[in-house]
């Protein structure tokens, strides 16, 4: 079992620019050096101990260059601390609060947080929900008078799937293991199928309400249909949806439709890695160290 990494341990480990750059260099070039200009795999000592110089074209590259830490506008220890807070605290932190705590502009904090969300997404990719899965849709966004049911109006429609454990428990108190939340255009069978095929293992037993879209989306799958009974038959799932909505309202107050999926990636990652005792921060840092840099426009489109 991995040792618990407390905030004190983390800050001592990454207390200086030197320690942060050493970690990033180890992650970035741990499997070998490849020059991103000419493709040569031979490196010599660079300008500093955290640089590598191509043995062929002599291009000098730093530990942060072409990573998600590329040209950040504040000290690396602060950036590492932000990653720890965003990954390990129960509800994360808004960009406004990050800006206040670390003394940076809100736009700077928001831009860096989007990079962290991108790494969180990468950490979760390819990890499908297995065994018993419950699925339902919900809306995230403002109210709109007269809109009911699956007519979303100006709201964003989100498909929420949870992997549940029924062992030694009544169905009402099923234990939630992992989750996925994805923005969908509508509740048609085609939209549902696209998301469910990507997020749920083909052999899983999927339980939904009687919405017709699920019937076509899950054709050929092990599919249970249950009446929602105003939430009584999906109590654990609906508590999870309730917590998701409270997180958006309470921490961020409002998330635009354009950026909602990135915040759902953050929510998914933090929930799915909640038992890693601080090690999830290291996982995200390692991913950021090997991920290519992203411009503002690229992050806006991600």
Set out the residue ranges of the language-model regions.
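Residue-level recognition of single "structural anchor" positions
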Residues: 1-302
